[in-house]
Structures are given as structure tokens and as C-alpha cells.
Amino acid sequence: MALQVRVITPDKIVWDGDVEEAILPSTSGQLGILPSHAPLLTNLDIGVMRVRLDKDWKSLVVMGGIAEVEQDILQVLVNSAEIGDDITKEDAQADFSEAQSRLEEANKGSDRREQIKASQAYKRARARLQAAGGLV
């Protein structure tokens, strides 16, 4: 039995296929979804979503959204998403270093809005680096 997964952004379908298992970055922690999962609606955080195809795992970076499970269908509606195989480690590492520096600078200041923006950029860069295989 398989779980049908669709990852949808406002402008395209990033993933549409059957998987054995999915792990989502929910706002309350990592959430595993298997076939025959109970109906569920949850918020997603910025992070790495993993799907298992037979014995291989694929990573996708998701930038917040919602996930719905119903009748062996997992629909993931996100602001944006990238498949990990499409991200180069070098680019992801450069983005991560830049985001880390920006976050450190923002945390020295008192502008809360800039701190939040820098924190979001850091989470995105970290997720991209993880999906590219640069962080565990």
C-alpha cells in the first residue's frame, strides 16, 4: 500500500507521486506519515520534508504551509518548495553562511522586524543545506 503525496506551491506542483512514508516539518516537530494514517490537518514550518521511495529517501525544502492527510493522500500546500537534488551544496553553503552572519547582526540590534526576517532566512538556508546533503 502506498501513500500518494502532492507538494503544491502557488505556481506549480513540485512533487506528485506515491511514496512509502513521508516526514514533515510541522510547527510542533517532525511528523511521520504512513499509509492508512488517520485524517490530519497540520501547520508546517520551514524545513526539510523527506519522502521514502522503496529504500531511497528524497528531500524537499518546504517554506511553511499546511499539510492534509485523508484516505492515503497527503497534500502539502506551501509558499515555496525545492527538491533537494536540485540544490548544489556549494550554493546552499554560501547562502547558509550569509544568513548566519545576517542573523548574528540582526540579533545585536533592537529592530524586532529585522530579527524575524533574518531568523526566517536562516531557517530557509539551513533547510536548503540539509536537503543538499551539507548538514545532518
UniProtKB/Swiss-Prot annotation:
Cell location: Cellular thylakoid membrane
Entries under InterPro entries matching the protein: ATP_synth_F1_dsu/esu, ATP_synth_F1_dsu/esu_N, ATP_synth_F1_esu_C, ATPsynth_dsu/esu_N
Disordered as annotated region, ranges: 95-115
Keyword Thylakoid: yes
Key word Disulfide bond present: no
GO cellular component terms attached to this protein's record: plasma membrane-derived thylakoid membrane; proton-transporting ATP synthase complex
Biased composition range(s): Basic and acidic residues: 101-115
Protein keywords: ATP synthesis, CF(1), Hydrogen ion transport, Ion transport, Membrane, Thylakoid, Transport
UniProt GO MF annotations: ATP binding; proton-transporting ATP synthase activity, rotational mechanism
Entry superkingdom: Bacteria
NCBIfam families per UniProt: ATP_synt_epsi
Oligomeric and partner information: F-type ATPases have 2 components, CF(1) - the catalytic core - and CF(0) - the membrane proton channel. CF(1) has five subunits: alpha(3), beta(3), gamma(1), delta(1), epsilon(1). CF(0) has three main subunits: a, b and c.
Protein family: Belongs to the ATPase epsilon chain family.
Name assigned to this protein: ATP synthase epsilon chain
